[in-house]
Regions:
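N-terminal Rossmann-like FAD-binding beta1-loop-alpha1 element of flavoenzymes
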Residues: 8-32
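Short beta-strand to alpha-helix junction loop
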Residues: 77-90, 129-148, 158, 213-221, ...
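Glycine-rich active-site loop/strand segments that organize a redox cofactor
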Residues: 52-85
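An anion/pyrophosphate-binding glycine-rich loop and adjacent beta-alpha core
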Residues: 226, 232-348, 414-420, 455, ...
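Glycine-rich loop(s) and the adjacent beta-strand/alpha-helix scaffold that form part
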Residues: 198-252, 397-414
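Conserved redox-cofactor binding core of oxidoreductases
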Residues: 97-190, 195, 202, 243-250, ...
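Glycine- and aromatic-enriched mobile tails/lids
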Residues: 1-6, 15, 23, 37-39, ...
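Extreme N-terminal leader/targeting segments of oxidoreductases
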Residues: 1-8, 26-27, 175-176, 186
Length: 584
């Protein structure tokens, strides 16, 4: 076991983690722990753009952006946070430009902008060009740019260090204070304790709960699971976004930028069906609306292909030079994975799990909450692992790359300033006990269940029973299945007993997180008897502001996987926009 001491420890090296590290590292001694090499983080898979009301191409302002974010989130957005994000978006983009990010340019040399779903001018009157982009590799460019700047500032990275626990020390009133993390070094199997004044979780989402997902194999909700197991709340975990355009049968992302450049969704009759569902902005309606519309087309017999189980994305009317210049990766993905050339034929697409709107509840400074009001001193979160909540029940495209930059920066500054103003708090007497017990149990010979089998069954039941459309019946079936899988998880066997690069062991750990988070999702979805944003109940098809204009707060009660989930609720913050009917 090795001990380390830093002012600030950041867990995760994607966009939010590295943006926080740039700010924190210039103010306090900072370490970044990541289970992946930083430039392999999932931020690199984001394609379409990062929005800001620069008004380089069309008239725009941050207030319209705020309104679109709130309406897009079906009014479950904390409006103070949305205002901050929209206001600070402009500087966030310009900061990246100064760091060297190669944005596409207008003929005049300004940052170019394109249309994206749900982004409008003058409170919904027409689509607006707000997304700043670097071809269809915007996330990749952001990741590379942030990493270069971390290296420039001398950020200390601990690569392939898998954080498995956060240490919390009670203060004089018995309330938790963050004091460190415990990490497993993949190369050696050794445990490392990082004593810190401030900890920032930026560990990403949990899309691998589902089979059909745009998420990488590594997005297993580790940070969410660690926090949940400490008895701390997770907010709005029933709200998962299903991106409308995943490659059919695979889930690989086809960016919304394709529709922003003029791509059209069509059914088996060749009809542009989104004209029926969203007459004003059609294919550029928010993602939850487009995804549900696509599923409805299939359910009503208008799907394409031999099994009529997908729709198509048509770009054959767009010049080939435009496609190659602005959407090169999308062209390659379609040809490589489906054998379809978008220049000459439409691309088969269907919704794919993409993003979790919920997460660790935080305030606008990135400080993590232990209940509806009180923060945990020294604990911060940013990015997809966090819930500010700027996305409400449905995130708008391009707001995620914005979120990681705005709130990653804020969390990094706040964590460093907290660390500079406080002394180290003593860690628990045996900081590695929880992790040692967890790993020992997984490595012991106590069963014959395989991790891969349980994970496959979990993902299949979540795809079938808790995805785009849900009912009481399907959710109860999902809950029964997940709880049965949790019982089987107690009897798993890990074949590799070695210490070096034991990925079998870590996949077993990840599966434990996925099982718990799947249950949190289903329990929250069962309790929310309405349809809002990414949560669509066929048995409760309408939004119910009277009973459910509130954030779900899920707490773990008891120890181990057989513990109960307690739900509480937190009010939504309103500043200027009252809820109204959501039409596009």
């Amino acid at each position: 076991m090795q001990f380390h001491k830093y002012d600030v420890v950041i867990v995760g090296a994607g966009g939010a983690g590295m943006r926080a590290a740039i700010e924190s590292g210039q103010r306090a001694r900072t370490a970044v722990l990541t289970k992946l090499y930083p430039t392999r983080s999932h931020t690199g898979a984001a394609q379409g753009g990062m929005c800001a009301a620069l008004a380089n191409v069309e008239e725009d302002n941050w207030e319209w952006h705020t309104f679109d974010t709130i309406k897009g989130g079906d009014y479950l957005v904390d409006q103070d946070a949305a205002e901050i994000m929209a206001k600070e978006a402009i500087d966030a983009v310009l900061d990246l430009e100064k760091m060297g990010l190669p944005f596409n340019r207008t003929p005049e040399g300004k940052i170019d902008q394109r249309r994206f779903g749900g982004h409008t001018r003058d409170h919904g009157k027409a689509a607006v060009r707000r997304a700043c982009y670097a071809a269809d590799r915007t996330g990749h460019m952001i990741l590379q740019t942030l990493y270069q700047n971390c290296v420039k500032h001398g950020t200390e990275f601990f690569n392939e260090f898998y954080v498995l626990d956060v240490n919390l020390t009670p203060d004089e009133n018995g309330n938790p204070v963050a004091t460190g993390v415990v990490a497993y070094e993949l190369a050696t199997g050794e445990l490392h304790v990082f004593h810190a004044k401030a900890i920032v979780f930026a560990s990403g989402g949990a899309g691998k709960i589902f089979k059909t997902t745009s998420n990488a194999h590594t997005l297993t909700g580790d940070g969410l699971g660690i926090i949940f197991r400490k008895g701390l709340p997770l907010e709005d975990m029933e709200f998962f976004q299903f991106h409308p355009t995943g490659l059919a049968g695979l889930g690989i992302l086809i960016s919304e930028a394709v529709r922003g450049e003029g791509g059209i969704l069509r059914n088996v009759d060749g009809e542009r069906f989104m004209e029926r569902y969203a007459p004003t902005i059609k294919d550029l309606a928010p993602r939850d609306i487009v995804a549900r519309s696509m599923v409805q087309e299939v359910l009503q017999g208008r799907g394409c292909g031999p099994n009529k189980d997908y729709v198509v994305l048509d770009v054959t009317h767009i010049p080939e030079e435009t496609l190659n210049a602005k959407l090169p990766d999308i062209m390659e993905f379609s040809r490589t994975y489906l054998g379809v050339d978008p220049v000459t034929e439409p691309v088969p697409v269907f919704p794919t799990c993409h993003y979790v709107m919920g997460g660790i509840p935080t305030n606008i400074h990135g400080e993590a909450l232990r209940d509806n009001e009180n923060v945990i001193p020294g604990l911060y979160a940013a990015g997809e692992v966090a819930c500010v909540s700027v996305h409400g029940s449905n995130r708008l495209g391009t707001n995620s790359l914005l979120d990681i930059n705005v709130f990653g920066r804020r969390a990094g500054i706040a964590a460093a300033e907290y660390a500079l103003g406080h002394d180290f708090v003593e860690m628990p007497e045996n900081p590695t006990t929880v992790v040692e017990d967890q790993l020992s149990l997984l490595l012991s010979e106590h069963g014959n269940e395989r991790v891969a089998d349980i994970r496959t069954e979990l993902q299949a039941t979540m795809d079938s029973h808790a995805s785009v459309y849900r009912t009481e019946e399907t959710l109860k079936q999902a809950l029964t299945d997940v709880q049965a899988l949790k019982d089987r998880y107690q009897r798993i066997t890990v074949a590799d007993k070695g210490k070096r690069y034991n990925t079998d062991l870590l996949e077993a750990v990840e599966l434990g997180f996925l099982l718990e988070l799947a249950e949190v999702l289903v329990v929250g979805a069962l309790a929310r008897k309405e349809s809002r944003g990414g949560h669509a109940r066929e048995d409760y098809p309408n939004r119910d502001d009277t009973n459910f204009m509130r954030h779900t707060m899920a707490y773990k009660e008891g120890e181990g996987l057989r513990s109960e989930i307690r739900l509480d609720y937190k009010p939504v913050t309103f500043t200027r926009y009252e809820p109204m009917e959501r039409k596009y």
